[in-house]
Every structure is written in structure tokens, then in C-alpha cells.
Amino acid sequence: LLYAPFLFDDAEQADYIYDTYLTDLYRDLLAAQNLHLLTWYEIGFQSVYATTPIMVPADARGKRFRVSSSLNARLFAEAIGADIIPLGFGEIVSSLQTGLIEAGENSVSLYARTGIADEAPHFSLTLHAFGVSVIVADKKWWDALPAEDRAVLTDSFPPISESRRLSRAQDLSDLMDPSLEIVVHPLSDDQRNAWRVASIDVTEQLIEKLGGRARDIYALILKGKAEYQGNQVNPEL
């Protein structure tokens, strides 16, 4: 659900919602699976890469579009009318070279320096899905550790604010690096809105297919978005 298209408007809004609501919630959800959440690791916003420019969803219609095994990836590709090609990450470069695929979606960190950019240099900043991963430990093992050892392990990771800053700085640096020869395509508001409109039903589809607490989590995210917007309007509150 957290990868639903346009679930978050920007990174700062996502930061607020993760810090205020989602971290505690997912710590509890993971604990129920005998996992202890150590920290989040930001992957970054996903955008669309391709061998030729894809500026609006109509440009992606019928394109051989690589998707991962995740449900959100398949539903997004269906929504924009792409020809869906499920592939593992390690198959992307060779599939671009042979023409099996023409496009796909990924974050800058998983695109710029992995060989994908060499074969599909056009990168359109749809910024449609905010990616994160988690670093976890076996909870039974974690709970049995002395407090001092838990503190050492926790402190071995940089503060989330610092890891976010470094990740975003690296993404920007990669996109601007002339040696990578990435053709970055910023989108106008109208172009980006076209992606939003095309994928507008995906979140509800995800909620229905995922079941469980997905709808409650979505409601919590909407609450966080409203709070964040209110804080921007009334920053003194």
C-alpha cells in the first residue's frame, strides 16, 4: 500500500507521515510477525525510465514495460496501458539490450548506477511512488540482548533525518552527473497530473486486494496528510 501511486505529494509530507504515524504502526505490525523494526531505509521516489521519452501516460500505452513482482507495480502498469513484462531486477539490463522491454519504473538509486541508465537513458520525473525498505531483526533475539547491545546496534545506523538527507543528495548528484548521460525530463504540472489521473483507481484496488488493515492504514495516511497541510497553512500551531 505504501507504494501506491501519488500516495504522498512530496518527500517532506512523506517524512511527516512516516515519523508521526507509520513508524510506530509498522513497529507494532512487524512485532506481531516476530520482527523488530530497527530503521527505515529510503529508496526514494520512483519515476519512469525508457529508451525513448515518455512524458505522459499515452506515451507508455503499448510499451513493453518491466514490472517487479509487487502488486502495486502491476496495477500501475495496467492503469497506464503498458504492455506488462514481469522481470526480476537482475534481468532488466539484458532485457533492455535485447528489446524485450522498452521502459519501466524505479528510483534514481536503483536506476542511475546499475546499468539501466546506459540502456534506457530517458528518465521522466513522474515521482509517482515513494519507496522505502526496512531493516529488521528477529524480535526474540532482539529482546534477549542486553540493553547496552541493543543501544550499540541502534546507534550504528545514522539518524533517519541524516540518511534521508544523504540519499536525496546522492539522487540529485546522480541525475546531474554528466558522465552518466541521463536525459532527465522534468514534467509540467499538467503532465504529472495526467499520470495521477491515469492511476487514480490503483490505491483503492490495492486496498481491496491487500485486505487486512490496508484501509485503516490508508485512513491514517489521509489523516497525516491533512495534518501536514494544516501545519503548512498555520505553521505556528
Can you say where each PLM-predicted feature lies in the sequence?
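N-terminal secretory/targeting leader peptides
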Residues: 1-13, 22, 30-237
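Phosphate/pyrophosphate-binding betaalpha-module
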Residues: 25
